Regions:
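A general structural motif
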Residues: 29-31, 71, 139-141
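General small-molecule cofactor/ligand-binding pocket signal
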Residues: 15, 77, 128
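Midchain, well-structured core segments that form catalytic/ion-binding scaffolds
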Residues: 81-82, 86-225
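Beta-strand segments within the central parallel beta-sheet cores of soluble alpha/beta enzyme folds
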Residues: 19, 33, 69-80, 217-224
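A generic, well-ordered mixed alpha/beta core segment in the N-terminal half of proteins
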Residues: 42-112
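Buried hydrophobic packing segments
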Residues: 3, 53-63, 199-202, 206
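Glycine-centered loop/turn motif at secondary-structure junctions
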Residues: 10-12, 67, 124
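Acidic/His- and Gly-rich active-site-bordering loop/insert found
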Residues: 1-45, 63
Length: 225
């Protein structure tokens, strides 16, 4: 509600799509998309996401005061699900905008067994409307996002700004390791099928694999066991 109010105060008309993305629209013609996300994670970096949304709103407010001298319009997007904090999905809000939403993610569930589709209903949304979030590529000039640095590279180089030339693609996997319970003091080591030990080996393998491909900018994280 606060972000929507800021958008209106900046001179935009505001709508919300089926995945909770707020869209502030200003000016006629083809669209320049500005924005970022307003969801977060525990202990996120300061201004992670909101910076890009606020920069977009301030940009529109500036040109609105000038009587809109631009030959194109601006849409400010505030994505509601970038982090995938609740469900094991990736970038669902922006993927819908791009027209590549993965509908199988609607069957995934959170830690309480609530599915993505069920959560949308509680939020007053209809999954059947997700396709309506898509932009026609012919109507879009570009997408620009201002974001905080999420790694230490600029800080280590003592540089205030950087231009991003590429970002990592994101995939999430849920792996189930099934073992066999046995007495801790009497089952011989060669006969053990300890699921936790197997999972630990997998965690170390993922770490090693990413480090071996560090030159390719590969990263990998095991976030939950």
């Amino acid at each position: 509600d606060v972000v929507a109010r800021w958008m209106r105060e900046a001179g935009m008309t505001v709508t919300e799509d089926a995945l909770g993305t707020l869209r502030g629209r200003a000016g006629p013609g083809k669209r320049l998309l500005l924005g970022s996300h307003i969801d977060s994670v525990i202990d996120a970096g300061n201004y992670d996401g909101p910076l890009g949304v606020i920069v977009g709103i301030l940009t529109v407010a500036h040109f609105h005061k000038l009587g809109w001298p631009l030959p194109f319009g601006i849409d400010v997007l505030a994505f509601g699900d970038e982090e995938g904090s609740r469900f094991p999905s990736t970038l669902s809000s922006s993927s819908a905008v791009a027209g590549i939403f993965q509908y199988d993610s609607l069957t995934t569930s959170d830690n309480h067994g609530v599915t993505f589709a069920e959560a949308l209903k509680v939020f007053g949304k209809n999954a059947a409307d997700i396709d309506k979030a898509r932009y026609n590529p012919d109507d879009v000039l570009a997408y620009v996002e201002t974001h905080i640095e999420q790694g230490p590279a600029l800080e280590a180089a003592n540089e205030p700004l950087g231009v991003v030339v590429g970002i990592v693609g994101q995939s999430r996997l849920r792996i189930v390791v099934t073992g066999e319970a046995g007495h801790a003091g009497t089952v011989p080591m060669p006969m053990r099928r300890d699921a936790l030990a197997g999972a630990a080996e997998m965690v170390l393998f993922v770490e090693t694999l990413a480090r071996d491909h560090a030159r390719d900018a590969m990263v990998a994280t095991v976030g939950r066991i």
